[in-house]
Amino acid sequence: MGRKWANIKEKKASKDKTNSRIYAKFGIEIYVAAKSGDPDPHANQKLRFVIERAKTYNVPKHIIDRAIEKAKGTGDETYSELRYEGFGPNGSMIIVDALTNNVNRTASDVRAAYSKNGGNMGVSGSVAYMFDNTAIFGVEGKDADELLELLMEVDIDVRDILDEDGQAIIYAEPEDFHKVQEGLKAAGIEEFTVAEIEMIPQNDIQLSGEDLEKFEKLIDALEDLEDVQKVYHNVELED
């Protein structure tokens, strides 16, 4: 297992600077998920996944409901899911996931963010092979041993369960996200501090001085882009 969730949180904290930005990004993601299938989350697994994620970020119910209602309308606004891979200073690797209604605009914006901040865009696959796509759940009130026993009782295998930062973190295969979540809910666990599918780096690197400063500016520039939903990287950031 690469970087633990305790370290990943430090990366995520830089992205989640304002509630308004979180809500806006989830609003689009929920709209797209609802528009691409049934607007009922019980009948749309993708929509249900996004809503569960939104709840861990305390996205208000009216934001979720508004996005779903918009998807029920007659508008035909089309969004594309895009992934960009690239490099920052001194061996740092970055993956950018975007959701956009204008592919050319997003590609140009991402490319400019890289070039203006000392980074370089890579080709598809140039970085992703150094990351593991992983389902992650955070549960408070139970330790790793208790969760392992619960999951064994419902015959669900996971990659690992670790006690981290006052909570138990479950790492599972991404395709098992819903199975693990439903198994936990069947065992009486309804609330999650984390419910994500993340790209976890297989190995972390540390940056310092000017390299770290350049890297942080690059990440900020990417995360500030309207169409960017998630940014993953392999740099270990301090608390």
From Swiss-Prot:
Annotated InterPro entries: Integrase-like_N, TACO1_YebC-like_2nd/3rd_dom, TACO1_YebC_N, Transcrip_reg_TACO1-like, Transcrip_reg_TACO1-like_dom3, Transcrip_reg_TACO1_YeeN, YebC-like
Compartments where found: Cytoplasm
Record has Cytoplasm as a keyword: yes
Domain of life: Bacteria
GO cellular component term of the entry, any: cytosol
Pfam families in the cross-refs: TACO1_YebC_N (PF20772), Transcrip_reg (PF01709)
Gene3D superfamilies cross-referenced by the UniProt entry: 1.10.10.200, 3.30.70.980
Residues spanning the membrane: none
One biological process term in Gene Ontology: regulation of DNA-templated transcription
UniProt keyword Transit peptide present: no
Keywords in alphabetical order: Cytoplasm, DNA-binding, Transcription, Transcription regulation
Molecular functions (GO terms): DNA binding
Entries under NCBIfam families matching the protein: PRK00110.1 (NF001030), PRK12378.1 (NF009044), YebC/PmpR family DNA-binding transcriptional regulator (TIGR01033)
Family the entry assigns: Belongs to the TACO1 family. YeeN subfamily.
Protein's recorded name: Probable transcriptional regulatory protein LMOf2365_0385
Gene source species: Listeria monocytogenes serotype 4b (strain F2365)
